[in-house]
């Protein structure tokens, strides 16, 4: 069971979740896009997920399109269609389309195409100016291996300057242009300007040339792929990012790094991460750079390792997000790496911490090539070093390359789906009743976990058939709003349901909101223990 396997936008999301993903995995990797589609940010698009094949569902979606809205992109593997609205279309028109299209039996969800933003001692001459490889104990690992070029790390980010003096030796030459471009769709992920530097910096941290007498030392000498999903302005649409993740997995990437976030929960992006995880990729992502905020997506998905940032003194960076999803910490403050054009600079952010973990994962797999992605994930956790921070700040601890490479994984444990396991018999059920109308359009609730070892929770709403009420949920106790939430269910009518897996660190915030009509409702929370 996975904490984020399906977002419960409607009851059929719960009923069809497993079969839908099975359909995704069995389809060919065919995508199509309309020429002239917006680059990078795609704020005028709505993404519609389907349970059947895209080709079979396209006519249904076409029939729901309002005037001047068009299908501009499809992805058969992940099972979604992108619909573009005119820029002057009202918010109400977009919301009405979402609700209308959700009436179709073969439609699973509809969501905005949100924007995510860019988050032995070697002989490299700038190694003395670095601290990140030393902090994560790379020198002990380098006595065993510098990394196997047969292990591939895909960087879903801005483009990488693949002919950079300190990167070209580690770029994966088995793929045309060492990657692909999902922003311009021209097949070449090369940066368009010197200011498009985030991807080159991230790639250099994970797998810049090490012990090559040039530039700085990357964490590993594994192979790099560039999956350009963020434009030169630093932003990218969820569909471009989802396509890049799927493509990376289809290329056989062992590790996928995502130093990006900020767009909120997306079912499309969740499906892409789950697809890649099931293909055998280890996914690593930046926790986010808004200290005090919860871990951003995609790092917060169960299929992804969320990484927080440490400064040189192994204290939590002032910008690093934190929360129960954090699995590992790594250096992210003032990290030296490559930038265009054959230059070097120091950047700060969880965007820098994430590729440190990705690089360590790469050469851990070089030393222990038989590990599955789940076993590799567990091994990185088990060999991490406690630096005295809370679990919400450091997760299992600071990643340690030396320990990960030199420690025998044994039988590896792990395996299977993330968060697998079944809930037990312990149950706690709470109910509340209320009435909402134009004079009282919403009610807010909070729920504190009650079972000894929480496993899952289902929040359900039952209201009048003549009204339309919606249900919003947060997992950190903050009061949800219609624009700030972690889960949402919004069918026609007033019967809604949201199910979530629990780690034990959550506190539920609940909002019952009037979309139209009025009347009484019953809210039920059922919590299951392990």
Curated annotation (Swiss-Prot):
InterPro entries: Peptidase_S8/S53_dom, Peptidase_S8/S53_dom_sf, Peptidase_S8_His-AS, Peptidase_S8_Ser-AS, Peptidase_S8_subtilisin-like, Peptidase_S8_subtilisin-rel, TAT_signal, Thermitase-like_dom. The active site is at 157 (charge relay system), 198 (charge relay system), 351 (charge relay system). It is found in: Secreted. Residues 126-405 form the Peptidase S8 domain. It comes from the Archaea. Transmembrane segments: none annotated. Residues 390-447 are annotated as: Disordered. One of its GO terms (molecular function) is serine-type endopeptidase activity. Predicted to be exported by the Tat system. The position of the signal peptide cleavage has not been experimentally proven. Optimum pH is 10.7. Residues 410-422 have a biased composition (Gly residues). SUPFAM superfamilies: Subtilisin-like. PROSITE patterns: SUBTILASE, SUBTILASE_HIS, SUBTILASE_SER, TAT. GO terms for biological process: proteolysis. GO terms for cellular component: extracellular region. Disulfide bonds: none annotated. Residues 28-119 form a propeptide. Its EC number is 3.4.21.-. The keyword Signal applies. Pfam families: Peptidase_S8. Residues 1-27 form the signal peptide. Residues 429-447 have a biased composition (Polar residues). Belongs to the peptidase S8 family. PANTHER family: CEREVISIN-RELATED (PTHR43806:SF11), PEPTIDASE S8 (PTHR43806). This is Halolysin. It comes from Natrialba asiatica (strain ATCC 700177 / DSM 12278 / JCM 9576 / FERM P-10747 / NBRC 102637 / 172P1). The lineage of its organism: Archaea, Methanobacteriati, Methanobacteriota, Stenosarchaea group, Halobacteria. The gene is hly.
